[in-house]
């Protein structure tokens, strides 16, 4: 099979796939190419980490069980470097603890094998779509001391900028657009992720916890027991 172009300007974007099973890597490559993406494949974690730094892909698909460095460690190092490229874990592991650990490290989604290659390509497209297409005139959102700029995709707690992953940003923005409205976990999965995550509603809880930890005392997020989440409406 000929190599898929890796020039991100020639296609919809470059996707880096870190997968040590050749058959699975080729299958992912084929479906991503059909969707219009360039694809670069690495077979071990160390090479994948170096390639991510060098190529600056639009998104990364990481197998958890990679040789050299596993996918979890690759994601951990990326986030430690303040690299917020969208990361989707692709793995045979289906244990809830593994899923939660991956999400807590800043992964945007978690896909377990066997998976539908077409759905995987759709999830990549969904993550990338959320980072683009915001009208230039869309005003910043403010709730309490938290300010979110949907155009530049930046979040501030007071005067300090807070680094969020793509999904953390989108989740916070969705809640801040309707202060006081309570969303169920199922609603948030449908409206923010656009599909049912393999990690289930637990993925919402993990991302909410991560946002709270990063915003600290200024976090406007409120848990409504037995229902879901909301942001505190500003006081008048």
Which residue stretches match the model-derived regions?
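N-terminal/domain-start alpha-helical segments
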Residues: 1-132, 236
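Residue-level signal for beta-strand positions within conserved beta-sheet cores that form or flank
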Residues: 11, 35, 83, 144, ...
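Short, well-ordered turn and helix-capping elements at secondary-structure junctions
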Residues: 43, 66, 70, 94, ...
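Residue-level recognition of specific faces of alpha-helices
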Residues: 65-68, 77, 86-89, 93, ...
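Positively charged, aromatic-enriched patches within helix-turn-helix-type DNA-binding elements
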Residues: 107, 112, 154-220, 225-227, ...
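Structural detector for helix-capping/boundary residues
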Residues: 118, 144-146, 151, 186, ...
């Amino acid at each position: 099979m000929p190599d898929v172009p890796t020039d991100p300007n020639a296609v919809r974007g470059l996707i880096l796939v870190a997968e040590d099973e050749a058959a699975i890597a080729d299958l992912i490559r084929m479906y991503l190419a059909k969707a219009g993406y360039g694809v670069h494949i690495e077979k071990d974690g160390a090479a994948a980490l170096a390639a991510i730094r060098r190529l600056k892909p639009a998104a990364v698909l990481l197998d958890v069980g990679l040789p050299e460095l596993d996918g979890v460690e690759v994601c951990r190092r990326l986030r430690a470097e303040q690299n917020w490229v969208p990361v989707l874990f692709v793995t045979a592991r289906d244990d809830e603890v593994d899923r939660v650990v991956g999400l807590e490290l800043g992964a945007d989604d978690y896909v377990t094998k066997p998976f539908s290659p077409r759905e995987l390509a759709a999830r990549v497209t969904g993550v990338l779509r959320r980072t683009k297409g915001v009208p230039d005139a869309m005003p910043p959102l403010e709730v309490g001391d938290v300010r979110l700029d949907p155009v530049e995709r930046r979040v501030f707690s007071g005067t300090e900028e807070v680094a969020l992953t793509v999904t953390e940003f989108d989740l916070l923005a969705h809640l801040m657009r309707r202060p006081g409205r309570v969303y169920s976990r199922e609603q948030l999965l449908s409206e923010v992720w656009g599909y049912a995550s393999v990690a289930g509603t637990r993925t919402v809880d993990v991302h909410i916890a991560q946002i709270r930890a990063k915003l600290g005392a200024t976090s406007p997020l409120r848990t409504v027991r037995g229902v879901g989440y909301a942001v505190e409406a500003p006081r008048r």
